[in-house]
Amino acid sequence: MAAVALGALSQGAAAADAAGRTLFTTRCGMCHQTNGMGVSILSRRPGDGSKGLLEQRDNLSAEFVYAVARVGTGNMPRIPRGEVSDEELRQIALYLSRGNP
């Protein structure tokens, strides 16, 4: 019985990640690109292999991602509800908080 429940949970998490990945690609990808790093300061440094700012982070909770997206910070503008719904942003935030992309 526990194996069945675990399998259903794994399928649910996989479906949530797929939905989050699709939303991230369509709603955030124009700036962050499919690897999630986006602009040069956030991405891996060419040539020396050092990590970019986002790759160094291991504490991006879903709540933090959601708040930053709604309010904006630094060079990242806020994302209004008319562009990305609360539910879509929640799915994106959960996807990113799981270490994706």
List the model feature ranges, each with a label.
Residues 46-100:
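Extracytoplasmic electron-transfer domains, predominantly the class I c-type cytochrome c fold
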Residues 7-23, 39:
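Electrostatic cytochrome c docking/interface patches
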Residues 21-50, 67, 98-101:
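Periplasmic/extracellular electron-transfer cofactor-ligation site
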